[in-house]
C-alpha cells in the first residue's frame, strides 16, 4: 500500500510539472522572501551548533547512550554549516560591493 502512495505522489508531481510546462498557473505555496530565507538559514546554523554543544556537554557528563563518534559527527556538521554560512556571507558582500562599484 505504501508503494502505491509513493507512486501517486510521483504522478501528482509529474502532473504539476506538465501543467507548469503548459503555462497554466498551479496552486503554488507562498514563497519566502530572500531575507526570510537568509534568516531561516541562519537559524538552522545556530540550531545545529546548539545541538552539537548540547551533545558534547552530555558526553562530557557521561550520560549513557551518547557515543564519541556521534558527538564528533555533530560537531563536524556544525562546523561545515558555519563554514557554508561564512562563504555565503562572503559571496553576498562581494556581490554587494560589485553592484555598488558599478557606474550608473
Swiss-Prot record:
InterPro entries referenced in this protein's UniProt entry, alphabetically: FliE
Keywords: Bacterial flagellum
GO BP annotations, alphabetical order: bacterial-type flagellum-dependent cell motility
Subcellular location: Bacterial flagellum basal body
GO MF term set: cytoskeletal motor activity; structural molecule activity
Keyword NAD: no
Aminoacyl-tRNA synthetase listed as a keyword: no
Family: Belongs to the FliE family.
Name of the protein this chain belongs to: Flagellar hook-basal body complex protein FliE
Organism per entry: Salmonella arizonae (strain ATCC BAA-731 / CDC346-86 / RSK2980)
Amino acid at each position: 500500500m505504501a508503494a502505491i502512495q509513493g507512486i501517486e505522489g510521483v504522478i501528482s508531481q509529474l502532473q504539476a510539472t506538465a501543467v507548469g510546462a503548459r503555462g497554466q498557473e498551479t496552486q503554488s505555496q507562498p514563497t519566502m522572501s530572500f531575507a526570510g530565507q537568509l534568516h531561516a538559514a541562519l537559524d538552522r546554523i545556530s540550531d545545529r551548533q546548539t545541538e552539537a554543544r548540547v551533545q558534547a556537554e552530555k558526553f562530557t557528563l557521561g550520560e549513557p547512550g551518547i557515543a564519541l563518534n556521534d558527538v564528533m559527527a555533530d560537531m563536524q556538521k556544525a562546523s561545515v554549516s558555519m563554514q557554508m554560512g561564512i562563504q555565503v556571507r562572503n559571496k553576498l558582500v562581494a556581490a554587494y560591493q560589485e553592484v555598488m562599484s558599478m557606474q550608473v
